[in-house]
């Protein structure tokens, strides 16, 4: 009886261990708070308006599931928050990956820019429901010293020095990825776009180099911008457009998620199986992993890592 009791206790203890995460590695990155230096247009395409993209970089040191993000920007004074009707997020590798190389020559440089095209499996859009968002007013009257809106031109007309100051409502958009984004370790650009009925969203700059409460990292690159006339190229907001003795900018955003240190390697035959095994061990089972990472179900988690593992 004593032996049976001991075995039952051991089995029960093992079950508790399996139901508890072996380790928890939350991920959080932020560029900090807006510095009032510049507002750069980041706009979804709409009738009569060019798509315009502003992007800034971040680094992942391990495979990471990104479950949410925030962005901070300026909308026109008096604009209801409900007029923010669509948000899309794309992730880019750093040039020359996913790009034509040598590039077109239509911009001063492509070194350290976002790639020509986005990572297809990492695009999320509130339209089809792969992200949802909420908006809050941070400051009803916020000013920036300069803006970049329309003056996004091929060289030699790239230097406009900006389009002057602006005042508007400072808003934060909190984004939840209903299909979380799974990325291997690497250097990336984060590109949000916002559609505002009756106005535009000016993505607000943050200090560069990053200062508290931001998350500094070695290799921080400056922000880039393009519109549909400039595709597939990008311009540096500071060096190429503002120019002179140019400041360089970060943009105000944050990312939240969890790392998966023992995930498989994309393109390898055992990637999916190794990743799922790592998740089960890390979170104490796949149901707990799906819940903690923000997936709607175990099937959704499996699909997310299947896409991650494709070369």
Predicted regions and their residues:
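Bacterial N-terminal signal peptides that target proteins for export
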Residues: 1-10
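Bacterial N-terminal signal peptides
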Residues: 9-19
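Boundary/junction segments of secreted and surface-exposed precursor proteins
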Residues: 21-47, 104-106, 258-278
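A short beta-strand-loop element at or near the start of a globular domain
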Residues: 35-77
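Aromatic- and Gly/Pro-enriched, solvent-exposed loop/edge beta-strand patches characteristic
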Residues: 51, 75, 81-218
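PGST-rich, cysteine-poor low-complexity/disordered linker and tail segments that act as flexible spacers
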Residues: 208-260
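Soluble extracellular-acting proteins and domains
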Residues: 260-311
